[in-house]
UniProtKB/Swiss-Prot annotation:
Domain of life: Eukaryota
Name of the protein in question: Methylsterol monooxygenase 1-2
Organism: Arabidopsis thaliana
Entry's localization field: Endoplasmic reticulum membrane
Catalysed transformations (reactions): 4,4-dimethyl-5alpha-cholest-7-en-3beta-ol + 6 Fe(II)-[cytochrome b5] + 3 O2 + 5 H(+) = 4alpha-carboxy-4beta-methyl-5alpha-cholest-7-ene-3beta-ol + 6 Fe(III)-[cytochrome b5] + 4 H2O; 24-methylenecycloartanol + 6 Fe(II)-[cytochrome b5] + 3 O2 + 5 H(+) = 4alpha-carboxy-4beta,14alpha-dimethyl-9beta,19-cyclo-5alpha-ergost-24(24(1))-en-3beta-ol + 6 Fe(III)-[cytochrome b5] + 4 H2O
Encoding gene per record: SMO1-2
Length: 299
């Protein structure tokens, strides 16, 4: 809770006038407890998970749009029915309500312990961006090793096989997993803010962006505007789709966000081999088409 009764008091304490964003934040949060602000994450989680995958649900369910976007689908021969996608949504929401939501409600002491602040001044844009970069890097590295653990025989058979029920993943399948796996993978998500604690707004953004990134990675589509085209070492849907395509025996593409861990530790060799093979086949196909067209033109 902000320890100022009025905007004037806040301005005096900061020795400057509040920015319009700080004024907006003051008006919204001044009378709300830090616990209440922290619990906003539950609402953000439910809304993002429910709404962000909807465009792709529409694309998959509609024949006209499905044909239009089929060239961007990574596994074009696999069609997910509306009923299967809705079942996935219901199963994940059940897990959110019974496991993730209650955990959020009781985990506030950890936020107090690492000193996530909610007062003024607000962090600068550069501070927010720098912290988010740290969070993504820390999450990616630690998630990589947790994910590798889940692909050992015991971890896969006991827990991770549930997540791999979708060999052609969809957005709603991003958090579709055993409840124990969801809890364990929450550690990499929390570790970044624990190492570099910031403002509650930064924490909100982190949870939201991480959820959106996971949904995009499991979308099953590689669009021209996908982030992998613009962010170096970003894996994206095409990269992670290979991991699901190979299935339970996959020892490749473990990283959650970036590709550098798989490259450093040699767990992307199968993926790179497949990419190279597909590229060679594509080039041969082009050459064959040129020869055929050339022959027809010569006649």
């Amino acid at each position: 809770m902000i320890p100022y009764a009025t905007i004037e008091e806040a301005s005096i304490a900061l020795s400057r006038n509040l920015t319009w964003l700080e004024t907006l934040w003051f008006d919204y949060s001044a009378t709300k407890s830090d616990y209440y602000l922290y619990c906003h994450n539950i609402l953000f989680l439910f809304l993002i998970f429910s709404l962000v995958p909807l465009p792709l649900v529409f694309i998959e369910s509609s024949q006209s749009t499905s044909d239009l976007f089929n060239r961007y689908k990574i596994q074009p021969k696999v069609k997910n029915s509306f009923s299967s996608m809705f079942k996935c949504y219901k199963d994940v929401m059940k897990m959110f309500i019974l496991v993730v939501g209650p955990l959020q409600l009781v985990s506030y002491p950890s936020i107090q312990m690492i000193e996530i602040r909610s007062g003024l001044p607000l962090p600068s844009c550069m501070e927010i961006v720098a912290q988010l970069v740290v969070y993504f890097l820390v999450e990616d590295y630690t998630n990589y090793w947790v994910h590798r653990f889940f692909h050992c025989k015991w971890g896969y058979e006991k827990f991770h096989h549930i997540h791999h029920e979708y060999t052609a993943p969809i957005g709603y399948a991003a958090p579709y997993a055993h409840w124990a796996e969801v809890l364990l993978l929450g550690i990499p998500t929390f570790l970044g803010p624990a190492i570099a604690p910031g403002h509650m707004i930064t924490f909100w953004l982190w949870i939201a962006l991480r959820q959106i990134e996971a949904i995009e990675t499991h979308s099953g589509y590689d669009f021209p505007w996908s982030l992998t085209k613009y962010i170096p070492f970003y894996g994206g849907a095409e990269y992670h789709d290979y991991h699901h395509y190979v299935g339970g025996q996959s020892q490749s593409n473990f990283a959650s966000v970036f590709t550098y861990c798989d490259y450093i530790y040699g767990t992307d060799k199968g993926y790179r081999f497949q990419k190279k093979l597909l590229q060679q086949m594509k080039e041969k196909s082009k050459k064959s088409n040129k020869l055929v067209n050339g022959g027809e033109k010569f006649d």
